[in-house]
Amino acid sequence: MIGAALVLGLVAGTCTGYLVQAGRAPTPLPPLSQPVLAQARGEAPAPLPAAQDRRVRTDGDLRELLLRKPRGATHTEWLKDGVRWLDLTAVAETWTEPGEAFGDLVRDEFRRSVMTVWEDDGHTVEIRLTQFRQEEYTAALHASEEARGWAEELAGDSWLIPGTGDGRAYVMTEPETESGFEDQYTAEAHAWRGDIAMDVWVTGPEPVGKNKIMDVAERQMERL
Protein backbone atom coordinates (compact mmCIF):
# COMPACT_ATOMS: atom_id res chain seq x y z
CA MET A 1 0.00 0.00 0.00
CA ILE A 2 2.78 2.43 0.86
CA GLY A 3 4.53 1.67 -2.38
CA ALA A 4 1.31 2.11 -4.36
CA ALA A 5 0.66 5.41 -2.64
CA LEU A 6 4.08 6.70 -3.50
CA VAL A 7 3.61 5.84 -7.15
CA LEU A 8 0.15 7.37 -7.28
CA GLY A 9 1.41 10.49 -5.53
CA LEU A 10 4.10 10.97 -8.12
CA VAL A 11 1.67 10.47 -10.98
CA ALA A 12 -0.94 12.77 -9.47
CA GLY A 13 1.65 15.47 -8.76
CA THR A 14 2.90 15.26 -12.31
CA CYS A 15 -0.61 15.61 -13.73
CA THR A 16 -1.30 18.65 -11.53
CA GLY A 17 1.95 20.24 -12.68
CA TYR A 18 0.98 19.81 -16.34
CA LEU A 19 -2.43 21.45 -15.71
CA VAL A 20 -0.87 24.46 -13.98
CA GLN A 21 1.78 24.87 -16.69
CA ALA A 22 -0.83 24.63 -19.43
CA GLY A 23 -2.58 27.75 -18.11
CA ARG A 24 0.54 29.92 -18.20
CA ALA A 25 1.95 31.96 -21.04
CA PRO A 26 4.91 30.30 -22.80
CA THR A 27 8.34 31.31 -21.54
CA PRO A 28 10.52 32.70 -24.34
CA LEU A 29 13.69 30.69 -25.07
CA PRO A 30 17.12 32.34 -24.94
CA PRO A 31 18.75 33.14 -28.29
CA LEU A 32 20.71 30.25 -29.79
CA SER A 33 23.34 32.35 -31.48
CA GLN A 34 26.75 32.69 -29.81
CA PRO A 35 29.16 35.61 -30.00
CA VAL A 36 31.37 35.44 -33.07
CA LEU A 37 34.89 34.41 -32.07
CA ALA A 38 37.78 36.30 -33.56
CA GLN A 39 39.71 34.22 -36.07
CA ALA A 40 43.49 34.14 -36.13
CA ARG A 41 44.94 35.96 -39.09
CA GLY A 42 48.14 35.47 -40.98
CA GLU A 43 50.10 32.36 -41.87
CA ALA A 44 50.65 29.47 -39.48
CA PRO A 45 54.06 29.40 -37.79
CA ALA A 46 56.73 27.55 -39.74
CA PRO A 47 57.72 24.11 -38.43
CA LEU A 48 60.81 24.01 -36.26
CA PRO A 49 64.06 22.97 -37.93
CA ALA A 50 65.75 19.69 -37.04
CA ALA A 51 68.19 21.54 -34.79
CA GLN A 52 65.28 22.60 -32.55
CA ASP A 53 62.86 19.70 -32.98
CA ARG A 54 64.40 16.29 -32.41
CA ARG A 55 61.40 14.47 -33.92
CA VAL A 56 62.17 16.00 -37.30
CA ARG A 57 65.38 13.96 -37.35
CA THR A 58 64.22 10.77 -35.65
CA ASP A 59 61.07 10.43 -37.79
CA GLY A 60 63.12 10.72 -40.97
CA ASP A 61 65.57 8.25 -42.47
CA LEU A 62 67.09 6.45 -39.49
CA ARG A 63 70.17 5.59 -41.53
CA GLU A 64 71.11 9.27 -41.61
CA LEU A 65 71.59 9.20 -37.82
CA LEU A 66 74.22 6.46 -37.91
CA LEU A 67 77.80 7.49 -37.25
CA ARG A 68 79.92 7.48 -40.40
CA LYS A 69 82.98 5.26 -40.58
CA PRO A 70 86.26 7.11 -40.04
CA ARG A 71 88.65 7.80 -42.89
CA GLY A 72 90.72 4.73 -43.67
CA ALA A 73 88.20 2.27 -42.23
CA THR A 74 86.45 -0.23 -44.50
CA HIS A 75 83.00 -1.76 -44.34
CA THR A 76 82.84 -5.53 -43.95
CA GLU A 77 82.49 -7.67 -47.07
CA TRP A 78 78.85 -8.55 -46.35
CA LEU A 79 77.95 -4.90 -45.84
CA LYS A 80 79.34 -3.22 -48.94
CA ASP A 81 76.96 -0.27 -48.85
CA GLY A 82 77.78 0.32 -45.19
CA VAL A 83 74.24 0.20 -43.81
CA ARG A 84 71.63 -2.49 -43.31
CA TRP A 85 67.99 -2.34 -42.25
CA LEU A 86 66.96 -4.94 -39.67
CA ASP A 87 63.36 -6.11 -39.44
CA LEU A 88 61.81 -7.53 -36.29
CA THR A 89 62.89 -11.10 -37.08
CA ALA A 90 66.48 -10.08 -37.85
CA VAL A 91 66.79 -8.22 -34.54
CA ALA A 92 65.31 -11.16 -32.62
CA GLU A 93 67.83 -13.53 -34.20
CA THR A 94 70.71 -11.56 -32.69
CA TRP A 95 69.65 -12.83 -29.24
CA THR A 96 70.42 -16.27 -27.81
CA GLU A 97 66.68 -17.01 -27.54
CA PRO A 98 65.16 -15.61 -30.78
CA GLY A 99 61.62 -16.81 -30.05
CA GLU A 100 61.50 -15.11 -26.67
CA ALA A 101 63.20 -12.01 -28.05
CA PHE A 102 60.63 -11.80 -30.87
CA GLY A 103 57.77 -11.70 -28.36
CA ASP A 104 59.56 -9.09 -26.27
CA LEU A 105 60.09 -6.86 -29.31
CA VAL A 106 56.41 -7.10 -30.24
CA ARG A 107 55.46 -6.19 -26.68
CA ASP A 108 57.92 -3.29 -26.73
CA GLU A 109 56.31 -1.90 -29.92
CA PHE A 110 59.35 -2.35 -32.14
CA ARG A 111 59.28 0.14 -35.01
CA ARG A 112 62.52 -0.24 -36.99
CA SER A 113 66.24 -0.85 -36.64
CA VAL A 114 69.35 -0.06 -38.65
CA MET A 115 73.00 -1.01 -38.31
CA THR A 116 76.45 -0.25 -39.69
CA VAL A 117 79.72 -2.18 -39.39
CA TRP A 118 83.29 -1.25 -40.26
CA GLU A 119 86.82 -2.51 -39.65
CA ASP A 120 89.45 -0.13 -38.37
CA ASP A 121 92.91 -0.64 -36.86
CA GLY A 122 92.38 -4.36 -36.28
CA HIS A 123 88.97 -3.93 -34.63
CA THR A 124 85.44 -4.45 -35.90
CA VAL A 125 82.95 -1.73 -34.91
CA GLU A 126 79.22 -2.41 -35.03
CA ILE A 127 76.55 0.19 -34.24
CA ARG A 128 72.85 -0.53 -34.04
CA LEU A 129 70.00 1.95 -33.58
CA THR A 130 66.60 0.51 -32.65
CA GLN A 131 63.51 2.71 -32.61
CA PHE A 132 60.26 1.97 -30.76
CA ARG A 133 56.76 3.42 -31.12
CA GLN A 134 56.49 4.01 -27.35
CA GLU A 135 52.72 4.39 -27.27
CA GLU A 136 52.49 2.48 -23.99
CA TYR A 137 55.82 3.03 -22.18
CA THR A 138 59.47 4.01 -22.66
CA ALA A 139 60.63 0.86 -24.46
CA ALA A 140 63.97 2.38 -25.50
CA LEU A 141 64.86 2.83 -21.83
CA HIS A 142 63.83 -0.76 -21.11
CA ALA A 143 65.91 -2.10 -24.02
CA SER A 144 68.98 -0.18 -22.88
CA GLU A 145 68.58 -1.38 -19.29
CA GLU A 146 68.31 -4.98 -20.46
CA ALA A 147 71.42 -4.70 -22.63
CA ARG A 148 73.39 -3.17 -19.77
CA GLY A 149 72.22 -5.96 -17.50
CA TRP A 150 73.71 -8.58 -19.81
CA ALA A 151 76.97 -6.61 -20.19
CA GLU A 152 77.41 -6.32 -16.43
CA GLU A 153 77.47 -10.11 -16.11
CA LEU A 154 80.76 -10.25 -18.02
CA ALA A 155 84.15 -9.62 -16.43
CA GLY A 156 85.46 -6.14 -17.06
CA ASP A 157 85.34 -2.42 -16.28
CA SER A 158 82.60 0.08 -17.03
CA TRP A 159 82.06 3.84 -17.13
CA LEU A 160 79.12 6.20 -17.53
CA ILE A 161 78.83 7.79 -20.98
CA PRO A 162 78.78 11.59 -20.48
CA GLY A 163 75.56 13.32 -21.47
CA THR A 164 73.44 10.16 -21.57
CA GLY A 165 72.15 9.91 -18.02
CA ASP A 166 72.46 6.17 -17.39
CA GLY A 167 74.26 5.13 -20.60
CA ARG A 168 77.30 2.99 -19.94
CA ALA A 169 80.38 1.60 -21.73
CA TYR A 170 81.99 -1.74 -20.88
CA VAL A 171 85.44 -3.17 -21.60
CA MET A 172 85.89 -6.92 -21.11
CA THR A 173 89.22 -7.84 -19.54
CA GLU A 174 88.99 -11.50 -20.55
CA PRO A 175 88.67 -12.66 -24.18
CA GLU A 176 85.84 -14.74 -25.54
CA THR A 177 87.18 -18.15 -26.49
CA GLU A 178 85.72 -20.69 -28.89
CA SER A 179 87.37 -23.82 -30.24
CA GLY A 180 88.66 -23.32 -33.76
CA PHE A 181 88.44 -19.52 -33.61
CA GLU A 182 90.81 -16.75 -32.59
CA ASP A 183 90.21 -15.31 -29.14
CA GLN A 184 88.23 -12.07 -29.26
CA TYR A 185 88.20 -9.15 -26.84
CA THR A 186 85.01 -7.13 -26.68
CA ALA A 187 83.90 -3.69 -25.57
CA GLU A 188 80.32 -2.47 -25.77
CA ALA A 189 78.18 0.55 -24.98
CA HIS A 190 74.45 0.91 -24.43
CA ALA A 191 72.41 4.10 -24.08
CA TRP A 192 69.10 5.59 -25.18
CA ARG A 193 67.59 8.93 -26.11
CA GLY A 194 63.89 9.52 -26.71
CA ASP A 195 62.51 6.52 -28.59
CA ILE A 196 65.87 5.18 -29.85
CA ALA A 197 68.16 2.66 -28.15
CA MET A 198 71.83 2.67 -29.15
CA ASP A 199 74.09 -0.39 -28.99
CA VAL A 200 77.80 -0.38 -29.89
CA TRP A 201 80.21 -3.32 -30.01
CA VAL A 202 83.95 -3.18 -30.70
CA THR A 203 85.74 -6.53 -31.05
CA GLY A 204 89.25 -7.65 -31.95
CA PRO A 205 92.11 -10.02 -31.12
CA GLU A 206 93.67 -7.39 -28.86
CA PRO A 207 92.08 -5.74 -25.80
CA VAL A 208 89.87 -2.75 -26.62
CA GLY A 209 90.79 0.42 -24.77
CA LYS A 210 88.37 2.62 -22.86
CA ASN A 211 89.05 5.58 -25.14
CA LYS A 212 88.06 3.57 -28.22
CA ILE A 213 84.61 2.49 -27.06
CA MET A 214 83.87 5.80 -25.34
CA ASP A 215 84.79 7.81 -28.45
CA VAL A 216 82.47 5.81 -30.71
CA ALA A 217 79.60 5.84 -28.19
CA GLU A 218 79.82 9.58 -27.47
CA ARG A 219 80.00 10.58 -31.13
CA GLN A 220 77.06 8.34 -32.00
CA MET A 221 74.92 9.76 -29.18
CA GLU A 222 75.70 13.28 -30.37
CA ARG A 223 73.89 12.45 -33.62
CA LEU A 224 70.72 11.54 -31.72
State each model region's role.
Residues 24, 135-137, 208:
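Residue-level signal for secondary-structure boundary sites
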Residues 135-187:
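Short Gly/Thr-rich strand-loop-strand
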Residues 1-8:
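N-terminal export and membrane-targeting signals
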Residues 5, 13-114:
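N-terminal "mature-domain start" segment
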Residues 178-224:
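Extracytoplasmic/luminal low-complexity segments enriched in Pro/Gly and acidic/polar residues
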Residues 112-140:
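A short acidic-to-branched-hydrophobic micro-motif
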Residues 129, 142, 213-217:
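Extracytoplasmic/secreted envelope proteins and their assembly/folding machinery
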Residues 117-118, 145-152, 220-224:
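Hydrophobic, Leu/Ile/Phe/Ala-enriched alpha-helical segments that form helix-helix packing faces
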